[in-house]
Amino acid sequence: MATYRLPHDATMTSHTIPDTIERTTELPHPVERVWAALTEPERFGSWFSDTAEWELREGAPLRLSFEHHGIAPGVIVAVEPMTRFAFRWGSDGEPLDAEHSTLVEWTLEPNADGGTTLTLIESGFATLHNGPEQIVDNTQGWREQFDAIAAYLAGG
C-alpha cells in the first residue's frame, strides 16, 4: 500500500507551492532486489524510462530518456548501498540548479516480512521556475512509477 502526502488544499502559486512529493510503499521483495532495480541503469530503464545511463558513484552524471518527454539529465548526489540513492535531475539544456532541477531521494528499509519499505522524496518545487505545473506532473508520474516498479519486481 502506498501513502502519498501533498497538501490538497494548497493554492498553486509561486509563493505557496508545496516543495515536496513523498511516497512510501511496502514491497514484498528483499532490499537487495529493490536496490538493484533502483541503481542498475539497465534495470531502472526497464521500469522507469526508455533508457537510463550512469556510473553508480556520487558526482556522476546521469541521463534518462523518455519517448514522450525527451531527455532528463542529472547528477548522482548520494549512494549509500542498500539504504539510500539520490540524484538531482532537470530538463535538457538547463542547469542543474535550484531554479531548474529537483532532488529525488530513494530510501530503502527492510521490513519485518523480509520485504522492503521504499520511500521516495522529491524536493525543490518551491524554487523551481515551473514549480506549479511540475509538481502536478511529477505527482502523477510517481503514482505511475510506483506501480511500474512493483510490476517490474513481481515479474523480474
Report each predicted region and the residues it spans.
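Short beta-edge strand/loop motif at the mouth of beta-sheet-based domains
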Residues: 22-23, 42-75
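A generic structural micro-feature
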Residues: 15-19, 68, 96-100, 134
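Conserved catalytic core of Hanks-type protein kinase domains
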Residues: 37-38, 79
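A conserved amphipathic terminal alpha-helix motif
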Residues: 2-8, 124-156
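Intrinsic-disorder/low-complexity, polar/charged segments enriched in Ser/Thr/Lys/Arg/Asp/Glu/Gln
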Residues: 18-24, 31, 61, 71, ...
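Hydrophobic-ligand binding "helix-grip"
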Residues: 53-55, 69-115, 123
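Short acidic N-proximal helix/loop "leader" segments that mark the beginning
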Residues: 1-22
